[in-house]
């Protein structure tokens, strides 16, 4: 049992800095400013479920999926970087509000009646939390621990789902507490956070792409 706790602790130490729930909370604050409390709670729960599912698939079938489709880790990083940068541009340069006219008001009311956009999978779960770095770490760790004799076989079977579940729970708790932050900073603060996070996401996306290109150069050099 002690080995199980050691494995879980080691997994959390490795994954939490990569998953970085606080970054996801800041992104959530920028994207969910106009959502109702119930919708924010629903998106928080869905994002946590998606993160758990992505990590489980990455651990048990990640390498198989990547080999089947011929996807490399550098390719995963570059693709994730493009997604992150695109999301960042949209946050940094949001669409301008329509001119105040009867037609614009009518259209605005129609849009308000429509369901809010689903942000749980993209970008909250992927690539913000379970991004290229997290997935790459899980896939590489999966192949490493299966060849290792540090832990018993039953620990290697039980620990990964528990680690991923705890990461998802930590993310869910962090996102649920974002409501208090929203009330504290107000709408203007949310817009400022959104622009700032947009800029940071563009930087992160570009860095993902650079890292992927550098890995390609090292591989084929």
Curated annotation (Swiss-Prot):
Domain of life: Bacteria
TM region positions: 8-28, 45-65, 69-89, 119-139, 155-175, 197-217
Protein name: UPF0056 inner membrane protein MarC
Xref: Pfam families: MarC (PF01914)
Record keyword Cytoplasm present: no
Segments in the Cytoplasmic topological domain: 29-44, 90-118, 176-196
UniProtKB keywords: Cell inner membrane, Cell membrane, Membrane, Transmembrane, Transmembrane helix
Gene that produces this protein: marC
Periplasmic topological domain: 1-7, 66-68, 140-154, 218-221
Family: Belongs to the UPF0056 (MarC) family.
Compartments (UniProt record): Cell inner membrane
Membrane topology category: Multi-pass membrane protein
Gene Ontology annotations for the cellular component aspect, listed alphabetically: plasma membrane
UniProt KW Cell inner membrane keyword: yes
Database matches in InterPro entries: Multi_antbiot-R_MarC
Organism this protein belongs to: Escherichia coli O1:K1 / APEC
């Amino acid at each position: 049992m002690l080995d199980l706790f050691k494995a879980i602790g080691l997994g959390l130490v490795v994954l939490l800095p990569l998953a970085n729930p606080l970054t996801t909370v800041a992104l959530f604050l920028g994207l969910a400013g106009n959502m109702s409390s119930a919708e924010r709670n629903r998106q928080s729960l869905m994002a946590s479920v998606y993160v758990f599912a992505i990590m489980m698939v990455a651990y048990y079938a990640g390498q198989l999926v990547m080999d089947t489709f011929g996807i490399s880790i550098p390719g995963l990083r570059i693709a994730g970087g493009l997604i992150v940068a695109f999301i960042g541009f949209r946050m940094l340069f949001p669409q301008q509000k329509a001119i105040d006219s009867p037609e614009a008001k009518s259209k605005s009311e129609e849009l308000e009646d429509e369901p809010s956009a689903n942000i749980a999978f993209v970008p909250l779960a992927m690539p913000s939390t379970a991004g290229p770095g997290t997935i790459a770490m899980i896939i590489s760790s999966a192949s490493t621990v299966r060849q290792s004799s540090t832990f018993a076989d039953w620990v290697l079977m039980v620990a990964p789902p528990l680690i991923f579940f705890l990461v998802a729970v930590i993310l869910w708790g962090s996102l649920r507490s974002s409501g208090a932050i929203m009330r504290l900073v107000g709408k203007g603060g949310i817009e400022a956070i959104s622009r700032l996070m947009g800029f940071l996401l563009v930087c992160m996306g570009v860095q993902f792409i650079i890292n992927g290109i550098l890995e390609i150069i090292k591989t084929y050099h």
